[in-house]
Structure formats: C-alpha cells, structure tokens
A protein has these predicted regions:
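Non-catalytic, mostly N-terminal accessory regions of nucleic-acid modification and defense proteins
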Residues: 1-96, 157-163
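Conserved S-adenosyl-L-methionine
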Residues: 78-177
Length: 180
C-alpha cells in the first residue's frame, strides 16, 4: 500500500479517517473485542474479489452508498443533513443534465455524502466535481464516496465549511451543472 505523504494528493487525503472511532464500545466492550471485530471486517474485505475494471457494477461504491442510506434511514430527521434519497437525487440529476453529454463542472454547495454529485456523473461525463460540506464527518464521507466510486482525486475538490458563512467556491463554479 502506498502512502500519500509528500505526494501531490496528500492534501486530498488529509484527515480522511479522523472521525473513525475505533475505541467505540459499539465495536465491542473491550480492546480485545474491538480488535477482533476490526480483524474480521478487514479479513472479510480482503477475501472479496473486486475486479472493478472488468465490470460496470460498482460493488464497493454501491455497498458504501447502501450503508449510507441505511444509516440515514435509522438516523431519522438528522439524515437530511447529509443524504439525498436515491429517488429525488436521480430526478434532480436528470433535470440538471437534460440534453448534456459533457459537463465541465458539477457543484453542490451542500454536498452531504456526495450522492447527488455522483448521480450527475451517471447522466453526463463530468470533468470536475466541486462540493462543500459543513460537518467534518460528512465531509469525509463525501470524499470517501467519491474515491470509492473511482473519481480521481485530481477531478474533485470538496471543501469543509459553511457555504453560507464562508463560500469556498469563490470564483469557482457556483451553479449545480455548468454547460461545457
């Protein structure tokens, strides 16, 4: 496994797993229990053959989005802070991309988990994804979601901050979809 330390991508991966709580009692009461759970998860993931180059089905990305959706459903009202359900996300992306095959920039000022941005990418060839998200946990979810879906770090820029108080887009795209 390669490190991003000193690489061009270092800033893009900085803090990606900061919100992971491996000491949470939800994983087990003791350190030994938590270690066993994490070992089983890692071993299970290592045993899965994911040859994403040979298939159009994004197994890991779909599983990740499914888990985000399940978490959102169980989170109740708070879920609206980070997850746009599949139906509305699909409709919005279809409307935004109507008649487009290439999109220079797709931007979401309240990116959440990034599912809406990714849906736009299902309807048009998006060159660059932009987003901003207020909460650090959801900001990291968004970045992980884009990475797991095969979006190269050079092709997205997600900011962590309050879009209304501090718009990090500046002179960057501020529309949802920009025609190429």
């Amino acid at each position: 496994m390669e490190s991003t330390m000193g690489a061009e991508s270092q800033d893009d991966f900085e803090g990606l797993f900061d919100d992971m709580q491996l000491d949470s009692t939800k994983l087990g009461r003791t350190v030994k229990d938590r270690s066993l759970v994490m070992s089983k998860i890692i071993a299970t993931l290592a045993d899965i053959t994911l040859n994403v180059d040979d298939t159009k089905i994004d197994i890991l990305g779909n599983a990740y989005e499914y888990l985000i959706g399940m978490f959102a459903a169980n989170a109740g009202k708070k879920a609206g802070e980070f997850y746009t359900p599949a139906g509305p996300a699909e409709l919005l992306s279809m409307i935004a991309c109507d008649g487009l095959t290439d999109v220079q920039d797709a931007a979401d000022p309240c990116a959440g988990s990034g599912s809406l941005l990714l849906r736009v990418g299902n309807h048009a060839n998006v060159r660059r994804y932009w987003g901003q998200e207020l909460t650090s946990q959801t900001y990291n979810l968004c970045r992980m979601n884009l990475i797991l879906r095969g979006i190269k770090y050079q092709n997205f820029q997600i900011f962590n901050g309050d879009t209304l108080a501090e718009d990090n887009f500046g002179d960057r795209p501020t529309v949802f979809c920009k025609y190429s």
